[in-house]
């Protein structure tokens, strides 16, 4: 039976959605209709939200799951009148923390994601700009400033991984696509040799690579299975010869790939 889940917040909804998604992912056999509702920051908005929750309960024949990070007690009480199963994230965790720390929390809306006074904000922006400026081997003269350089065949997941690490952790990651010419030379390009300690390889199953490339250039040599199989085989051989740590990206999310790379390379996150 499909269930409905709401991620409700009086701020951006990032915390409610992130934690809620992680919890729901543990129930792989149950399909969910998921809805994020940010900035529910007034009694009127809360009452409209109650109507949506109740409508979903009537439609589904079972009460929705509600993940909320509402700070205002009055708004929380209004939501509690709905026909939903409430998981109040702040109340669940803040009360035990207050007891352990012998201190009262500030109960501030959007505290962890605010820009003002947040030294991480500029780090994040600079890291994202670095990833974009050094994407796809377009520029290589700033590699000395990189924390990591991802290498692999075209369309194996290098760019989204670099951007995720930049956004989430402030990591300055460049990426370089290994071409057929590089494979025929049987060695790393000179620009990569100088930064061998920063290299991490991404590989991918040939059939998956074929499907991805077919969306970009259908019925071309570039997207043919034979070409994809050749490139993957040669790049994996290059990784072994050059002793470059690597991971197959086929069955991992960008979050999992990023975490594995940081652990393998011992790179510290600029912020957590």
Curated annotation (Swiss-Prot):
Transmembrane recorded as keyword: no
Sites where the protein binds ADP: 152-159
Record has Signal as a keyword: no
Catalyzed reaction equations: [pyruvate, water dikinase] + ADP = [pyruvate, water dikinase]-phosphate + AMP + H(+); [pyruvate, water dikinase]-phosphate + phosphate + H(+) = [pyruvate, water dikinase] + diphosphate
Gene Ontology molecular function, alphabetical: ADP binding; ATP binding; phosphotransferase activity, phosphate group as acceptor; protein serine/threonine kinase activity
Source organism, top-level taxon: Bacteria
Keywords, sorted A to Z: Kinase, Nucleotide-binding, Serine/threonine-protein kinase, Transferase
The protein's Enzyme Commission number: 2.7.11.33, 2.7.4.28
Protein purpose: Bifunctional serine/threonine kinase and phosphorylase involved in the regulation of the phosphoenolpyruvate synthase (PEPS) by catalyzing its phosphorylation/dephosphorylation.
PANTHER family for the chain: PYRUVATE, PHOSPHATE DIKINASE REGULATORY PROTEIN 1, CHLOROPLASTIC
Family: Belongs to the pyruvate, phosphate/water dikinase regulatory protein family. PSRP subfamily.
Record protein name field: Putative phosphoenolpyruvate synthase regulatory protein
